Amino acid sequence: MRCLPVFIILLLLIPSAPSVDAQRKTKDDVPLASFHDNAKRTLKRLWNKRSCCPQEFLCCLYLVK
């Protein structure tokens, strides 16, 4: 029975989780998943060039212009 009051006090000391987000999103916030999707799409477009030589990565970059 001694443990019950200690347990209740510990429960009261634990902060509860906020029901809403603490920080509001701004227009500059971009989900990280969309950033990775854009990077993958760009790399895929660079590698899908017909005249791109796999041995030389730099030749792919010159064809993007």
From Swiss-Prot:
GO terms for cellular component: extracellular region. Residues 1-19 form the signal peptide. Contains 2 disulfide bonds that can be either 'C1-C3, C2-C4' or 'C1-C4, C2-C3', since these disulfide connectivities have been observed for conotoxins with cysteine framework V (for examples, see AC P0DQQ7 and AC P81755). The cysteine framework is V (CC-CC). Keywords: Cleavage on pair of basic residues, Disulfide bond, Secreted, Signal, Toxin. Belongs to the conotoxin T superfamily. It comes from Conus litteratus (Lettered cone). Disulfide bonds: none annotated. Pfam families: Chi-conotoxin (PF16981). GO terms for molecular function: toxin activity. This is Conotoxin Lt5.1. Expressed by the venom duct. Residues 20-48 form a propeptide. The keyword Secreted applies.
